[in-house]
């Protein structure tokens, strides 16, 4: 643990190799510029000469493992220096990115939120929905299983427009190599939907949420918790074309989201700074459906692309610091199947199941169910 400790060797047999390995604490000091690999090599001596042929350090709180070869002159051979990533801290970085991942997953089109609102009668409506799913991300094999709840009310303010609001709550449990975590969002949304007789619609929604995250990592900076805030604004346009009981509905949507920065200290005393994260997701897609006596059934497909999505997490302690950059931007596909059913008595039920493919964040499954009562 200390460079003051010395290994004095009386004689080194020809052909033998000696490796001196320092603790993670020494690795952190080297990363902070308070010590050097050459000083570590010099802790083993034969007479007044360095006996080390190779040096290395274990994982520190901030620094990953280091290694290097030592020349005959006792100096480090620069071309052999290797610095590994502290895997536990990379997991913490990935956990911090869950805020953006889960916030982006809460983006939803009008049909997911309200079901077949066109079929609703009455000037007002109350509705509730729940979504449950799983997402996967990163080299650490992070799996986040989440539940998403909304409770809303809306009212017609004209022949074409309805205006409403909703309370939202999300809770998730994540697991990954050497750790686990939880994430919770509490917030609200306001929306306006324009539904026209020609089958076209415009849907506008703004959302806010307060996010709480905690993680427990075996090693590195250790465990911690923090809070941040998320905002998003979305606009969607679509038009339904009917033909003999079947219909197709092209859709286009643009969503901007932002998760604010956060600063916190872990249980191991490390300071962590998470940069703010921006997301700008464009979506082009369609749904293809068939009208049935009780409502309709449909399949849908969309291509989504996040034009932003990059962020970084910086961890530091005692002058040692490391940063992890992540880019969640890029495109992915979304496929779904669902139904909207008239249960009678001004009540409608809707169910949707989806999966994604081709993106950095994979959602193998998610189901979404809701009920709406109009009066």
Language-model region placement:
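Outer-membrane translocation/initiation segment of Type V secreted surface proteins
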Residues: 1-10, 14-159
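Membrane translocator/pore-forming domains, dominated by Gram-negative outer-membrane beta-barrels
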Residues: 89, 122-125, 129-375
């Amino acid at each position: 643990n200390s460079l003051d400790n010395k290994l004095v060797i009386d004689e080194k047999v020809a052909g033998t190799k000696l490796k001196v390995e320092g603790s993670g604490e020494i690795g952190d000091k080297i990363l902070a510029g308070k010590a050097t690999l050459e000083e570590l090599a010099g802790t083993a001596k034969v007479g007044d000469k360095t006996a080390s042929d190779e040096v290395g350090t274990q994982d520190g709180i901030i620094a990953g493992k280091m290694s290097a070869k030592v020349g005959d002159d006792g100096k480090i051979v620069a071309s052999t220096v290797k610095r590994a990533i502290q895997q536990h801290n990379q997991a913490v970085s990935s956990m911090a990115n869950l805020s953006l991942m889960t916030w982006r997953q809460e983006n939803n089109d009008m049909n997911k939120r309200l079901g077949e609102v066109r079929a609703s009668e009455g000037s007002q409506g109350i509705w509730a929905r729940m979504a449950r799913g799983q997402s996967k991300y990163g080299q650490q094999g992070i799996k986040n299983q989440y539940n998403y709840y909304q409770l809303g009310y809306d009212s017609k303010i004209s022949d074409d427009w309805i205006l409403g609001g909703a309370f939202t709550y999300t809770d998730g449990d994540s697991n990954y190599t050497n750790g686990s975590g939880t994430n919770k969002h509490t917030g609200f949304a306001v929306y306006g939907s324009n539904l026209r007789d020609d089958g076209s619609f415009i849907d506008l929604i703004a959302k806010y949420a307060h996010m709480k995250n905690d993680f427990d990592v075996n090693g590195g900076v250790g465990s911690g918790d923090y809070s941040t805030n998320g905002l998003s604004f979305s606009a969607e346009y679509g038009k339904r074309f009917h033909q003999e009981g079947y219909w197709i509905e092209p859709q286009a949507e643009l969503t901007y989201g932002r998760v604010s920065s956060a600063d916190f200290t872990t249980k191991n005393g490390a300071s962590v700074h998470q940069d703010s994260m921006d997301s700008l997701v464009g979506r082009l897609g369609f749904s293809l459906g068939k009208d049935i006596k009780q409502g309709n059934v449909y399949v849908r497909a969309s291509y989504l692309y996040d034009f932003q999505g990059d962020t970084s997490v910086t961890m530091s302690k005692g002058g040692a610091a490391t940063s992890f950059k992540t880019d969640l931007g890029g495109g992915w596909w979304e496929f779904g199947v669902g139904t909207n059913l008239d249960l009678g008595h001004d009540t409608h039920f809707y169910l949707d199941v989806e999966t994604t493919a081709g993106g950095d964040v994979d959602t193998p499954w998610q189901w979404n169910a809701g009920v709406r009562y109009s009066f």
